[in-house]
């Protein structure tokens, strides 16, 4: 029995010794170095004229990546206003990449897919320039409400606002330029003149104020409600006209100005 133990221990020592026995397991390879890609983008209207991200409410540019060797996909998101960007490190491989422009109203535009893009280890791959073509035209569909139970036009004694006349102007927020659009108040045309606002009779709270063919942009509307010669109600909301022939639908509320003599 004693002899058997010696043989076993000697055999074990031989098998595990540093100079002989079984070879050591190989050290596994490290992760493959990642790469990046870079891109730049531009926005144009349907006539090819450059437009800004703010003009169409553009917020982000998203690259949607599909690595052909992997199921599913990933996204890389950039701020629209920067006009260019470089991704964080991504696995090397052969990619197909789609592009989306997203804004405050949702998806604004897409750009043509770029396919067969090789991302190499430790390198940056510049993509072809990306162009988003956008129908930079939209509209407005508004109602105006004094929040009086009797409505905008009824006498104050009847719980109305007692408004007898109104004016409307529309200006671009950036730069303050007047937009000389022709609105429709119900079925009646109304042409905006910021220098000399045109007076019309009281606009009822269920009467639509609409416009089409407006350049998409961020605007400030100025509505004034008069009791005879006094400006007694006002609204100065900012309104973003969306692109792609969509219309902004909103009720704008009139607030009392507190002008002396108003009822």
Feature locations, PLM:
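Bacterial Sec-dependent N-terminal signal peptides
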Residues: 12-46, 122, 129-144, 244, ...
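Short amphipathic, basic-aromatic surface patches that mediate peripheral association
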Residues: 40-54, 144-158
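Intrinsically disordered, low-complexity serine/threonine-rich repeat tracts
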Residues: 16-33, 57, 71, 159-162, ...
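Sec-dependent bacterial lipoprotein signal peptides
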Residues: 1-15
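Beta-strand signatures of extracellular beta-sandwich domains
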Residues: 60-64, 98, 167-171, 222
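Short, acidic Ser/Thr/Gly-rich low-complexity loop/linker segments typical of extracellular
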Residues: 68-84, 175-207
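Structured interaction patches on ligand/partner-binding surfaces of diverse proteins
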Residues: 79-82, 102-135, 201, 225-263
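Short Pro-Gly-centered beta-turn/loop motif in secreted/extracellular proteins
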Residues: 80-104, 199-220
